[in-house]
Design a protein with these regions (language model features):
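Glycine-rich active-site/cofactor-binding loop and its immediate structural neighborhood
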Residues: 62-95
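Short glycine-aspartate micro-motif
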Residues: 62-64, 99-101, 182
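Acidic beta-strand-loop-alpha-helix segment within the catalytic core
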Residues: 82, 86-172, 223-246
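General beta-strand structural signal in soluble alpha/beta enzymes
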Residues: 47-51, 65, 74, 162-165, ...
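Residue-level signal for inorganic ion chemistry
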Residues: 28, 39, 71, 103, ...
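Oxyanion/phosphate-interacting regions
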Residues: 1-10, 152-155, 172-246
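Short, Asp-centered acidic motifs that coordinate Mg2+ and/or phosphate
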Residues: 47, 136, 180-181
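N-terminal subdomain of lithium-sensitive/metallo-dependent phosphomonoesterases centered on the IMPase/IPPase/PAP
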Residues: 1-68, 241-246
Length: 246
């Protein structure tokens, strides 16, 4: 897919408006077409929820697709963007049974099955156990004013920040112990986290949507939005949520 769109001038033209409300770029559309075609070819009806196409009813199984998480990185050639696919047995976050995240930059494939753990390139995740402090926080935000407005409340319990530009990749890094917590200052949709959240939860880590219903009841749709906090322990996750409210 990327070989067909090698240059920035190929990837970034706006070709439409996604049902999620954002512009659809050429790379968004190309990846979505390829993934949906593959899913359709595998047969079996499913209800599709995709950032670009919207909701396509079709069966009791739900497939939640984010063709490109980190579109600006993808357009500019920064190697931090991903494909996310989640499979669910119903319309809520708690119904997700399988998650897949592909990191285009590193080539890493992250997967999780409900009740069967999380894996990286087919091997079980065995990262460092969660810490009781945050040495590295993966902060996801699109505007400098959001970062400037919230970082003062983080000073007391966060040592260092990293901003990758892909919420799904950040959550995968948390699941593997590469970062200690994740905080999205911009409200995210279900398509942004449906796959990666399962890796976090299968590791026994905590994740919350402060502006949404209880996490498991959060709908798999394109309307609901909430900031996201996640950490290795429920205490750290609660501290992050409290910092957001300040």
């Amino acid at each position: 897919m990327l070989a067909e769109l090698p240059a920035r001038s190929d990837r970034e033209p706006v070709v439409g408006a996604g049902m999620g409300g954002d512009d659809t770029t050429a790379i968004d559309a190309a990846v979505e077409r390829a993934v949906v075609a593959r899913l359709d070819a595998d047969g079996g009806g499913f209800t599709l929820v995709s950032e670009e196409l919207g909701v396509r009813p079709g069966g009791e199984t739900w497939v939640v697709l984010d063709p490109i998480d980190g579109s600006i990185n993808a357009k500019r050639g920064l190697p931090f963007f991903s494909l996310s696919v989640a499979v669910a047995e119903g319309p809520t976050m708690g119904d997700v049974t399988f998650g897949y995240v592909y990191d285009f930059g590193s080539g890493e494939e992250w997967t999780a099955e409900r009740g069967r753990g999380a894996r990286l390139n087919g091997e079980p995740l065995r990262g460092e156990p969660p810490k009781d402090r945050i040495e590295i926080l993966a902060l996801e935000a699109t505007r400098t004013d959001l970062v400037a407005g919230h970082t003062p409340s983080l000073v007391d319990f966060v040592h260092r920040l990293r901003i990758f530009g892909s919420l799904a990749i950040s959550l995968c890094h948390l699941a593997d112990g590469r970062v200690d917590a994740v905080c999205s200052l911009k409200a995210a949709r279900a398509v942004d986290i449906a796959a990666a959240q399962l890796l976090v939860r299968e590791r026994g880590y905590a994740i919350d949507l402060p502006e949404a219903p209880p996490f498991e009841a959060a709908p798999l749709d394109l309307e609901g939005r909430s900031r996201v906090v996640a950490a290795g322990t429920t205490g750290l996750c609660a501290a992050m949520a409290a910092a957001l409210s300040e």
